[in-house]
Amino acid sequence: MNKMLLAGSTGIVLLSAAASPVWADDNASTFSLGYAQSHTNHAGTLRGVRLANNYEMSPDWGLTTSFAWLNGSQRYSDESSNGRVTTRYYSLLAGPSWKINNQLSLYSQVGPVLLHQRDHGIDSKVGYGYSAGVAYTPVSSVAITLGYEGADFDATHNSGSLNSNGFNLGVGYRF
């Protein structure tokens, strides 16, 4: 089931990205790079980067795609052992953007997320991610983005479902 979810989500994201030719002259694109931070209920706080592209397909609507990579480690200690857990988080999301005016637009995204943990062994979990945010363009070629990103994963243990919630802040170039 997880592999089907990952394959389907990845296919949708890649087809969406391919459907938006960023080399077109008539429509604007905004590439942004920024800081991302997320907190998982089992792996602690993760920090990393987010790369995004917003392609304006019409005067009001666009397509936003993003890739996030976050990393973190956390010490643990219990009755039987102690050590450090290293966690990596990858997301590939896509969705629509709505241009409210020349300076402000909103976006939402969905797509696959991979959480990779290393302790005594390796454990990977596939889930789905979702994101929403705002992009502010104070001048014609610069954009500032602020967004929320969350993810849900299937639990492989008895302590409940694994999820993450975080934010991202980026600066982009619009052309």
Predicted regions and their residues:
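Cleavable N-terminal export/targeting peptides
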Residues: 1-28
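Short glycine/proline- and aromatic-enriched beta-strand/turn motifs that initiate or cap beta-hairpins
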Residues: 20-75, 90, 104, 114, ...
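Outer-envelope exported proteins of Gram-negative bacteria
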Residues: 52-54, 64-66, 91-95, 107-111, ...
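Outer-membrane beta-barrel strand-turn architecture
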Residues: 55-59, 98-102, 136-140, 175
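Outer-membrane beta-barrel translocator/channel fold
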Residues: 66-85, 111-115, 147-156
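Helix-adjacent hinge/juxtasegments
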Residues: 81-103, 107
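Outer-membrane beta-barrel "beta-signal"
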Residues: 134-138, 143, 163-175
